[in-house]
């Protein structure tokens, strides 16, 4: 399969890269060479979704972070560790879920020796969206969970507000049940971290009750 190379001045989409009769393995291999948006130039590698191929629940975040970019795996940094802890407290087996992001490359800016996260724009989200759609189509999850505003607005509409609608069941073609909550990275930044963590666990317990 040829790689799609599109520079940052053009509207790109990963759609031509989606393999026929996709499987997670085929999708991961194809995504490794994606150049549908300029983020491939600054990201270390594509960070594709990971988890059980029979997952009832799919968690969707915004994009990989610094550690995820270096390791090539989603949710392995501080936010991922917090998610793991919350899943355990909510009674959800981490090995039985699937985690991914709406954007598969790390967008960042340099600040001294650190790489600081930058929010992807709508063009970048749109270019990468076919990968997520294909993942969900293969997995056919019972529950899809949007983690944070970027994922929620990308999948449920730009008017969606996690601050008002977190924990609500939302109709969507993505899964039998779709729900949004905060991204675990926001809990790490919160002054009342313990309170926010408990609220996050409560949201996850609602999800546990759906499966």
Predicted features and spans:
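A polyanion-binding, active-site-adjacent surface
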Residues: 2-211
């Amino acid at each position: 399969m040829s790689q799609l190379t599109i520079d940052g001045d053009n509207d790109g989409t990963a759609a031509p890269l989606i393999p026929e009769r996709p499987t997670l393995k085929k999708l991961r291999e194809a995504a490794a060479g994606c150049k549908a948006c300029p983020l491939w130039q600054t990201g270390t590698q594509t960070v594709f979704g990971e988890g059980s191929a029979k997952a009832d629940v799919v968690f969707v975040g915004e994009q990989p972070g610094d550690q995820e970019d270096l390791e090539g795996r989603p949710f392995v940094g501080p936010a991922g560790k917090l998610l793991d802890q919350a899943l355990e407290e909510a009674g959800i087996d981490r090995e039985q879920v699937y985690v991914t992001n709406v954007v598969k490359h790390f967008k960042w800016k340099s600040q001294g020796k650190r790489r600081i996260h930058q929010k992807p724009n709508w063009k970048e989200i749109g270019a990468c969206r076919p990968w997520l759609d294909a993942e969900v189509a293969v997995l056919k999850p019972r529950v899809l969970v949007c983690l944070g505003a970027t994922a929620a607005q990308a999948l449920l509409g730009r008017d969606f507000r996690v601050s008002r609608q977190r924990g609500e069941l939302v109709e969507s073609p993505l899964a039998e049940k779709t729900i949004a909550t905060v991204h675990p990275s926001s809990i790490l930044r919160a002054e009342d971290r313990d309170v926010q963590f408990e609220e996050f666990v409560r949201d996850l317990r609602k999800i546990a009750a759906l499966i």
